[in-house]
Amino acid sequence: MNSKIVMCGCTESGVETLEFLIEQNITINYIVSLDEEQAKKWNVSGYCSFEKLSKKYNIPIYYPESYSLNQKEDLDFFQHHSFDLLILGGWQRLIPDNILSTLKIGGIGVHGSSEMLPKGRGRSPVNWSLIEGKNRYILQLFLMTPGIDDGDILDFQTFDINKWDTCRTVYYKISVVQKRKLLELIPKIIKNEFKRIPQTGEPTFYPKRTPDDGLINWNQTSEKLYDFIRAITKPYPGAFSYLDNKKIKIWKAQPFDNKITYDQNKVGQIVEIFSSGDFVVNCYTGSLLVTEYDGTVSLSKIFTS
């Protein structure tokens, strides 16, 4: 396989995918990634450096002037190298048209949600799928365009979102599926033996999420709160609430009970604290057991939004 391939990535799943492809004798000629300072500047959740992998396999890295690849130096880089194929491996920005036009074959994008594209385009689909309590995820590989996840679909696979999953475990599953599908797809694309499935139907879009969106609304069922917390736990900034104007980060929780009731207590009130430090919060329906958190809590205190 003599084609020149570049991977754009800056997350753990991208690192894992790249190493897997190399071990399966897929030659990656260049990496486009971010350094730690750039990742902080552009608020990249789940950032992972490609530097060790670059040194291990002697693959050069280009650190762009812009995460959006919209600076002259970035275009110059792609024009100079004239890659055949670009693969995304954890790159949370659209690739500009002038970059895509430098590619001889094209670019492979990766996107997923609980529905087939064009449903579920946009930002943070893993988080939104968990928040919405979905029980499946469809990872789709598509031919990149400058638009938002609107290229022809090249391949896809459905997997479960079970009741124990968090955003991290869903990303583990994405990593497994992404590796397998890319290994199958790359040789077909190089040989021009791939099928394209146009997207049909009315698109829907997920909006961007920010750290401020992690504020907990306790006036919900314990099941809804569980979904919310597991959707934005590590490696994301996490769910949070306030006690006496102090922010408390909540990383892990689960529904406690619907039959042990706390009718005399207010919604958001801490109704139990156990010797382990775990505590129970009264919810609109049921109660929530919090088992991993940052901060100090006190019995009978009430969380505020």
Please annotate each region the language model reported.
Residues 256-278:
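A conserved acidic, glycine/proline-rich C-terminal tail/linker
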Residues 242-255:
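Short, structured protein-protein interaction patches enriched in aromatics and acidic/basic residues
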Residues 1-240, 246, 275, 279-280, ...:
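One-carbon transfer enzymes
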